[in-house]
């Protein structure tokens, strides 16, 4: 369904974008499926390479925060959003080859996504940042400290797989790192997160009052998206809450709800 005129942006609002199905080829020979969402009528000013939550607990490229970022940020903030399924993960887009490997061989998946963004020419994908959620934050910390990446935004970081050596690597890189930590998170809450991330002097830990690990609720979605935009494209926030133009209302798809860890 579509309509013209100013409308409130809601959970199921899909704003205009140029959407392209993509495939990533890993160094160990796997094909991963994904999507690149671009601003509808101009080149992007920044790029998010997204890393989804734990696939064994329902995480995939369509986990709701990542999907809503792709629905809104290209049109509202001229930000490109790259989403993909890590090895062995399935979504309506398809299934990536391989099998889940407990954050070990997933290093090849992260590298393939970063390389895709780095070499893109039509259009160039500038100002590249990692956006990880839960398990995806571990992948960002472990494998995302790449010369072509400006920094990282971490949503609900559990620090389950990433170790002190990975935090040290980010500390010595000097790259900005922002961790958005729900007040009521199931795994790592703001106070403990501040202690853990003190190993990275430039890290900024933002506690979000009332939020939980899955960020359910439109107010939390808007808070997350505003923090993302403030980090990668300062001055473009706060995002509008209405859209004066064509919109599409998405239909719920099986299995696209909030993920686990």
PLM features: residue spans?
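Short alpha-helix in the alpha/beta-hydrolase fold that links the catalytic acid
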Residues: 165-167, 188-198, 220
